[in-house]
């Protein structure tokens, strides 16, 4: 089996690329970073530090790389069995034209073996969004062929991969946590379902997407925002602060109550999942900076994201949300000189006041009870 993976960054190398290569799949990375491309093509291998209770070093081998903006990537799409991405939500639109060209070439070459494309991004149904961009870039006469022969498979991914400065200045070395979860929608594949260790197939993807968003992402963000306010440097430092831990755990329990109601999750199993996530935040090997995790607060405070979406669920089912409100208030306080969204957030609050600013960012009604609760909590933190 041959695969092409867009994005040779830390997540690409440390998570999806590693799983594919470990499964014995012939893997090519596509990226724009020439330093990384040259290193991959010179060595065809790299090291991954897997850290949890203990630390181990795995070597990923037998890989190569092409530029994601050259002709080679188009040729590969015409030949491979699987295309995956870990490029970030914004970049999906940028890689769509190359994918479309590759699919046209595949059709012209008469290659009718099924191709499956899986976007492994921190977003809900990212592959469906990528499909929209690809279809827009395709000529009309290729669209029906692509619908017939190409599967666009949505997925949910979970592994903490912080940016790590390699002690050896190796551009390929990467550190990841032991835990990883890659869940894909088995109803969207073309051809035979793949058997890749570490890839879990489900016919109920949204339950897993929301479980991760409402627990890992909600908890991670609130830990970062409260941690930054309290002067902590890392996620570990923040979650070991008992006051912060109580709010984070409380928020994950509030969002969890929504999941249990919505998807009939087992309450005990979900409580264990929350405990496991708190343990991941404590990982001493992951130097996960609160400022990195907190960045892009406007996106994280938007209606479909990790803070407001679970809050809307609590309103839908009439459930408590005190700790989620604390997290939202802390997010409104997030300041970072390196993050344009943090600066935009500060300017918006200064210009409109916290009530109107939160309503504009989140889509919540400015006169609603929850906005007033969040504003009260926000002011109490000043």
UniProtKB/Swiss-Prot annotation:
GO molecular function, one term: mannitol-1-phosphate 5-dehydrogenase activity
UniProt-annotated binding residues for NAD(+): 3-14
InterPro entries per record: 6-PGluconate_DH-like_C_sf (IPR008927), 6PGD_dom2 (IPR013328), Mannitol_1_phos_5_DH (IPR023028), Mannitol_DH (IPR000669), Mannitol_DH_C (IPR013118), Mannitol_DH_CS (IPR023027), Mannitol_DH_N (IPR013131), NAD(P)-bd_dom_sf (IPR036291)
UniProt modified residues of type N6-acetyllysine: 269
Pfam families: Mannitol_dh, Mannitol_dh_C
Keyword Oxidoreductase: yes
Keyword Transcription in annotation: no
A GO-annotated cellular component: cytosol
Catalytic activity: D-mannitol 1-phosphate + NAD(+) = beta-D-fructose 6-phosphate + NADH + H(+)
A single BP term in Gene Ontology: mannitol catabolic process
Family affiliation: Belongs to the mannitol dehydrogenase family.
Protein name as it appears in the record: Mannitol-1-phosphate 5-dehydrogenase
Taxonomic source organism: Escherichia coli O45:K1 (strain S88 / ExPEC)
Lineage of producing organism: Bacteria, Pseudomonadati, Pseudomonadota, Gammaproteobacteria, Enterobacterales
Gene name of the record: mtlD
